Amino acid sequence: MQFFSTRDTNRKVTSSEAIAQGLSDEGGLFVPESFPQVDVRALCELDYPALAAAVIREYLTDYSPEFLAQAARTTYGEAFGGKAGYLAPVEGDTYALELWHGPTCAFKDYALQLMPRLLVEAKKNLGRTEKTLILVATSVDTGKAALDGYHDIPGVEIAVFYPTGGTSEIQRLQMATQEGANVAVYAVRGNFDDAQTGVKKVFGDKAIAAELEQRGIRLSSANSINWGRLVPQIVYYFAAYAQLLKAGKIAFGDAVDFCVPTGNFGDILAGYYAKRMGLPVGKLVCASNENNVLTDFLTTGTYTAKREFFKTTSPSMDILVSSNLERLLYHVTGSDTEVAGLMKSLAENGSYTVRPETLAAIQETFACGWSSEKEVAGEIRARYEQDGYLCDTHTAVAFHVAAQKKRSGVPMVVLSTASPFKFPRSVLEALGRTAPENDFEAMQQLEAATGHAAPASLAALRQKAERFDTVIDPAQIAEVALGYQA
């Protein structure tokens, strides 16, 4: 399997090169040359680690099947507490795919616990011995998951950049207390898009790349712009379908809809790949919060990033520049020239408009909707009081939109992307309680109010020492990168 850039299909690389490099030289994202067709029925018989290895090896063809099988078995074992890809019934034929049972209590663990192994193996495959410097812009959960996955990995340094004031206190402490000799964390003045733009500028700066290479350092990414982040997320769509099949809730071949809370479009794009591989995915419903740039685009065909930015209770979705949408645009248009033009317009004008036939093709698979802050709080309370199901703010966004887009007779799977205990104050307030200012006190009150236990890794943060408190401007991200030595 070869990969090429969304902006220049003449730039072809192997999967190892795509993962080691992260972003194409001209700024495009790597995509596979084709969608492998798989035996869905056979895959549905496998446990999660075996399923992961089987799906991933269809794309990572220069990795040995033995390596992928062992890596998947190691990754998705004890660290996920036996709940990798766990599907929970909620109400009727609506389900929650709980993706927060990993080490950092967010769906990013599915990719970022495996990805360090993929990177180390990629370097072996390519015969590379240089140090890898990973730069991560995060709306929060990616940062902690990347830090947890990459800490103390030999030959790797990782620096994470998150928007100051754009996280819950629990999320901030998850990053600020991270252990490891090779990790660094910076708060960036501004929002996620400011951090992401700063990191992308470093990746696109040939002078910085040349200077670092002279020191024996190569840049790479752990954001979902890296193919190694995206491919493990395809797996849990198959896992959800398999569980519905085994439970007798569907017959083989029946369509299942998925509603995904997303800002950067990576998690929902993984569902698109699953569909193109042959999984009977019906509609992929894109759920946004008040930063509803994706809802507007999927409705009108015009993407406008120049708009008011809202800090919401679902901060991982507080994004206005959605990177992975570029991959979908390439797959739908089939034109690197067209995609390059659209991305140029976005960079220069803050907007672009796709052709009507492109929008129509996208709407065949994708539906959309958004939730206000009031609706998010109401959804948390409704799900708990009516169904006994406790969810976080991001998942509540998706539940609200899923109810609007639910099709009669078609099961709806909502991707539950984070533990409710990562946002204890917001969840407690949504349940009609007065939340204390301290997140840990709120966590204890949420436990008492609901009878649910907070994940041990979150409760333990209270006793951990903070290591990182540096605040920088977006323009200083380049200085951070240039400060590294081999």
Regions found by a protein language model. Give the residues of each.
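PLP-dependent amino-acid enzyme catalytic core
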Residues: 1-486
